[in-house]
Amino acid sequence: MEEFQVYLELNRSRRHDFLYPLLFREYIYALAHDHGLNKSMIFLENQGYGNKFSSLIVKRLIIRMDQQNHLIISANDSNQNSFFGHNNNLYSQMISSGFAVIVEIPFSLRLVSYSQGEEVAKSHNLQSIHSIFPFLEDKFSHLNYVLDVLIPHPIHLEILVQALRYWVKDASSLHLLRFSLYEYCNLKSFITPKKSISILNTRLFFFLYNSHAREYESIFLFLRNQSSHLRSTSSGVFLERIYFYGKIEYLVEVFYNDFQNNLGLFKDPFIHFIRYQGKTILASKDTPLLMNKWKYYFVDLWQYYFYMWSQSGRVRINQLSKYSLDFLGYLSSVRLNPSVVRSQMLENSFIIDNAMKKLDTRIPIISLIGSLSKAKFCNTLGHPISKPTWADSSDSDIIDRFVRICRNLSHYHSGSSKKKSLYRIKYILRFSCVKTLARKHKSTVRAFLKRLGSEFLEEFFTETEDEHVFSLIFPRVFFTSRKLYRGRIWYLDIICINALVNHE
């Protein structure tokens, strides 16, 4: 770790020129190994990589790379000219994990120098997934339409390599990355949403994908900013559109590669852009015709600049008042909240009907039950079933597992507008736990509950520490029996999507 810190203190002008030699350092692979262990602890999963890692294998890998005279081997001749011998998969996993650590160094250096600035405020809470929903509550109620964009996957590996050329200036590292991708990955099925990648390191894969997505985001954000700062132009050229829009103020010409279009971008301070997983949301107060303009701009940008085949069907225009957006485990929509105000003036009284827009966040109960069914907690109809694979554990371990899953889901879906769906999920997990314990003790559910009583499962509905704080602040909105808070709560400590929520 000390050598890694020493490298970070190198001269800024030469930092990016020394990435490739780090592949011959053992501590790089130790860092990658430690990161894999930390990730497995966070997700409570055994990745199996720790059993294969050893310093002896790392030394053998470094010796093989040091003795190799050339790295450029044709992808078609990869079987005849094997670079690592019979341990191709293991060595390629180690190289990709080490490269994932190395390629992030320029970004880490930039982050360190950025955080040392005096004007930078601490924003650790913005790392939470829930931090986006208060923003949506403030902004989406004033918007009309949303573009639901499915980001296309690159059809060629070279696109991913080219996306890094602007950030990583080390040609040797880029050649090694290109060689690894062509040598060990199938070009036709490398990036598919339903196909797991066993050879390429997951950390490296997400880094490449985010770098690729950032390329088109930077172009889009540039156009978005220019649309609000360009000088006013004469509306005489757009006489045929005055009837529909009134005076049009802004026009920008974009020239990128062979893609040349005149895009009439109109000043719109109410446009918001969000990217999550493999999707993008573009919400605006524009008219449907303007949203169509953005739709076909995305398609043309992907096809002519990024050479990715995309269809207009991947970009859908929806009205927020009539459409529920499947977003980070919530179904979000804008609904009208009616209210009646009675006004008394002397002897006359007036009743005023008022309707305000409000962001409604609900739990996608059907998809969540599908995730529970896939995990063998219930059937496809939502009826609880036993978990036979856990029946060999102790009673306390079984109860602890179910309670932990239940509380994690409650913690993640605490921002739901309607708690009824959340209670149903708790019911499924509660009785799945009972059936698992009854199966272990070879008894029926009724006999098991009669013998031990139902009080031992009250942990599923007991008040958590956070809910206790809210009960002290808002005592009137809590139930006297169960003390469950009905309002929406957004937590600032959620850094990843729950595995059951991310059913895709």
Swiss-Prot record:
PANTHER family: MATURASE K (PTHR34811:SF1). Coiled coil: none annotated. Keywords: Chloroplast, mRNA processing, Plastid, RNA-binding, tRNA processing. Pfam families: Intron_maturas2, MatK_N. GO terms for biological process: mRNA processing; RNA splicing; tRNA processing. Belongs to the intron maturase 2 family. MatK subfamily. It comes from Bombax buonopozense. It is found in: Plastid, Chloroplast. GO terms for molecular function: RNA binding. The keyword RNA-binding applies. One of its GO terms (cellular component) is chloroplast. InterPro entries: Domain_X, Maturase_MatK, Maturase_MatK_N. It comes from the Eukaryota. Usually encoded in the trnK tRNA gene intron. Probably assists in splicing its own and other chloroplast group II introns. Transmembrane segments: none annotated. This is Maturase K.
